[in-house]
């Protein structure tokens, strides 16, 4: 069922992109948008995981090099009924983590050195359980495709005035200009809403997997505080939604709540409290 929801969302966002192309440049725009969307979805599906791991200089590790982490992940994957994901460590001091990959068999979990150095074993277990919940519900693919299509719509809007069409039913210039401003914002809101809802679901999944909601509450509190004082130099806004805590938490951003990739830490802790 979760895989069906994933592909349904991918299809819906792709159709939105194609429709936007048609509104800007008629049938020609629809064809171009379809080809661009197909190419971007193909790339996102097969290669986005390696791209993001490379961007953060993540190094693969095994049981011999990270036995404690490996044992935690191994225990939780058995409990969740998941295959063992590939494990990576990011050489950064901000405590954080993310999951990536297109399905159960091609999943990876990456944690920073800061997470391993500054968190307790219980907090690390809660964070790993959160990331495994993302894997279980195909959230990595959903987030990747949502970000890809949102970026594509913004790109199409930026170049919208250069598309031409001979179709007589093309909307007037005022409608087209309005769409060029509205559609990228709408796509971003869809992306952020999807991301926030999935964070709540993964938090709940972590609490149920470990049986200790308080472990994740403690982890989220510390992660949020550290994110405000320790930067993640390689952090990219396009991948911020992947992390358990927004790596930009310490920065002031206009319209922060509307366009935040994560619900507030306070809201997440409050929801976890209800699970006790």
UniProtKB/Swiss-Prot annotation:
Query: What CDD domains does UniProt report for this protein, alphabetically?
Result: M48B_HtpX_like
Membrane topology term reads: Multi-pass membrane protein
Query: GO CC terms on record?
Result: plasma membrane
Protein name listed in UniProt:
Protease HtpX homolog
EC number(s) per UniProt?
A: 3.4.24.-
Q: Which GO terms describe its biological process?
A: proteolysis
Enzyme class, spelled out: hydrolase
Q: What is its main location?
A: membrane
The UniProt keywords, alphabetically, are: Cell inner membrane, Cell membrane, Hydrolase, Membrane, Metal-binding, Metalloprotease, Protease, Transmembrane, Transmembrane helix, Zinc
**InterPro entries named in the record:** HtpX_protease (IPR050083), Pept_M48_protease_HtpX (IPR022919), Peptidase_M48 (IPR001915)
Please indicate if the UniProt record lists DNA-binding as a keyword: no
User: Where does the chain cross the membrane?
Assistant: 16-36, 142-162, 173-193
* Active-site residues, as the UniProt record annotates them: 131
Please name the source species.
Sulfurovum sp. (strain NBC37-1)
Question: Entry's Pfam families?
Answer: Peptidase_M48 (PF01435)
Return the PANTHER family for the record. Answer: PROTEASE HTPX
Which free-text remark accompanies the cofactor? Answer: Binds 1 zinc ion per subunit.
Q: Where in the cell is it found?
A: Cell inner membrane
Superkingdom per UniProt: Bacteria
């Amino acid at each position: 069922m979760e895989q069906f929801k994933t592909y349904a969302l991918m299809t819906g966002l792709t159709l939105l992109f194609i429709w936007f192309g048609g509104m800007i440049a008629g049938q020609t725009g629809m064809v171009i948008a379809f080809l661009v969307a197909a190419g971007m979805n193909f790339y996102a599906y097969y290669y986005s995981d390696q791209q993001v791991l490379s961007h953060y200089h993540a190094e693969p590790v095994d049981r011999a090099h990270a036995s404690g982490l490996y044992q935690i992940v191994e225990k939780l994957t058995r409990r969740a009924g998941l295959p063992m994901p590939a494990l990576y460590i990011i050489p950064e001091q901000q405590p954080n983590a993310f999951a990536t990959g297109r399905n159960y068999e091609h999943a990876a979990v990456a944690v920073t050195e800061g997470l391993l150095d500054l968190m307790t074993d219980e907090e690390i277990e809660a964070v790993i359980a959160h990331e495994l919940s993302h894997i279980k519900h195909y959230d990595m693919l959903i987030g990747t495709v949502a970000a890809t299509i949102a970026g594509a719509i913004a790109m199409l809007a930026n170049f919208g005035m250069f598309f031409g069409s001979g179709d007589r039913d093309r909307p007037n210039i005022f409608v087209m200009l309005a769409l060029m401003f509205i559609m990228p914002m709408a796509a971003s809101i869809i992306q952020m809403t999807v991301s926030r809802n999935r964070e709540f679901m993964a938090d709940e999944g972590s609490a149920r997997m470990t049986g200790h909601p308080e472990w994740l509450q403690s982890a989220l509190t510390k992660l949020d505080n550290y994110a405000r004082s320790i930067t993640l130099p390689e952090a990219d806004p396009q991948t911020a939604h992947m992390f358990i805590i927004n790596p930009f938490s310490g920065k002031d951003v206009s319209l922060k709540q509307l366009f935040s990739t994560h619900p507030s830490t306070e809201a997440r802790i409050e929801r976890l409290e209800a699970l006790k």
